[in-house]
Structure formats: C-alpha cells, structure tokens
Amino acid sequence: MLKEVDLAAQTLFAELLQRSLDAEFDAEYRENGSFIRKRSKEREYWHYQWRDGDKIRNKYVGPVSDAAISDRVQRFSSLKASFKRRQTLVRALVAAGLPTPDPLSGRIVEALWKAGFFRLRGVLVGTLAFQAYAGVLGVELGRRPLMTQDADFAQFWGVSENIGDSIEPPLKILRGVDETFRQVPHVSDPFVSTRYRNGQDYLVDFLTPNRGSEDHQGKVVRMRALAGSGAAPLRHLDFLIHEPERSVLLHAGGVPVTIPRAERYAVHKLIVAVDRVNQAKSVKDIEQASILIDVLAVRRPAELAEAWKTAWSTGKEWRRKLESGRARLPGEAQATLKNTVEGSR
C-alpha cells in the first residue's frame, strides 16, 4: 500500500516548486533588458531582448498562452530567489520521505537546467522523472523503482529545429560536471553521438520522437537546439512528452524540471515494457506503471482514463502492446486500471 506524504510536506513541496520556478526565471534573465512578444504561425511567444555592446540579443522564453510564464514576465522585477530557503525546504522534504537523486544524477540534471535545456522545451524522462512524481502526487514511491544509473533527456525535433535558440554542446555541459564523460560513437554515424558515458559507466542519452518512417529507427537525428548534437529517434516518445508538467528534483536548492504528465508516463511504460529486450528493465517499467496507476486512480482518474483512451485509439499495434502491458500488471493494478477507464465513460 502506498503511503501518502503528509499535508505539511505537500505544502512545503508546493512552496519549493514555486520558488524554484521563480529562481529559474530570475537566473535566466539577469541582463538589463525587456520582454517582448513575437508572433509565429498564429501563436504569440515571449522573448527576452537585451543589448550586448552594439548588438541586440534575443532569447526565447515561452508561449504567451502559458499563464505561469506570462505571470512571471509581469512580476519579473519583484522576483527574488532565496537559495538558502530552498535548501531548507529540500532538506525538510527529504526528511519527510520524498526521494532525492544520487549526487551525480542531481548535478547532471542541474547542469542541463542551468544550460537552458528545459527553457527550450526539453523534457526529463526515465527513472529520474519518475522520482519527481512523489512531490507532484503527494506520495512516497518506495526505493527499488527509483534506482538508476542513467539520465534521459528528450525534445521534439520540430521544437529543436524552430525554437531559434540553443544550449551549449551536451558534452561540454557534462564535462563541467564530470570531466571523464566521453561521447559514445553511434553505429550509424561515428561523427555524432546521442549517448555519453563517464568513467563509472553512467549514461546520459538524448532522445527525440520518431513519428515517421521505420528507416529513422537506429539512426541519429541532429538537433539544432542541442548545438547540432544528436538524439536517438524513438517510437511512442511523442505520446510520452506531449504537454508535459513541471516538478522539482530534490537536489541542492531544488532543480526545476519538465517531466511527462504522470498519466502518460504510466501508460507509456505499459507500451515500452512489451518491446524491452532487457527483462530487468521491463519489470521495472511495469513496477513504475503499477505504482502510478494506483495513485492516479485516486488523484487524477479522468486524466488516467483519457491517456489510456488516447493511446488505445492510436492504432492496432498500440492496442496490442497496451493489452500485453496491462496483462503484466499485478492483478489489483489491472482491476484498478480497468475500473478507472470504464468509470470515465
């Protein structure tokens, strides 16, 4: 049985999330500049513009339709980031039972955050993202499903191509954390990498959805927002990272991250568990899905049902994998999922 985090800890997490997002915004736009609106393909986006010598610089901020971003634009002059207070909140939340990443994982995600990866609509996926659901959903997640020796980051190719901004090369960012990181040459292109490994075999992967031909599988996609570095195209990833949510990793003073919506993460795990060659990873997929299904059936039943129905309606192959993945769930989780989906009709 899952243990809920007490109400006091949930309140502290909400404060940490707010302060971390404010700190993120404050740190990104320290120059003496101003926010402007730009229109692209019938949508408006915030950009930050400042003078650098005799040049006018411009940085993408986010869509005007995002109420949280627009609110911070309006409050920008009054935002004050308190790192010490955030550290205190992190310590209190860890003491309350919420998970914290191992130090290396925390530093890697923090480095990507500071480099602007999440500002450029990148998404943290995999087990590190799963850790971040504890605070969002207000539950303890146990220990075994939280263990990892890798970090996975994803971004839509279309976003990367058209956002008009870029982080530094991933290898440079990672070597700022651990100088033993090296590129892992890709079999299809030895001059570009999607994976990086350090001296202790910790892996960092960059991924992008494959919504096209099967010919793209196993290849490298160059990502403009990753300074031209590569990402591995994967099926089903577009479903996972569609309309993500924000959370905080409990590292240092809190690291604000963008993660998949929990209901999509759960359904996606049922799909990918079927394709896994590595049995241990497949078991972990099902374990994480089962935990989230139990929580979401109470916290977000309509959203869980909608995520399932969206995946189910995608096509015959998706339905086959969903059925197979669901059958691998513990009996109680199978029943919970079935009742949640049927109850939403």
Question: For the regions a protein language model found, what residue spans apply to each?
Answer:
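Compositionally biased terminal segments of proteins
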Residues: 1-44, 51-345
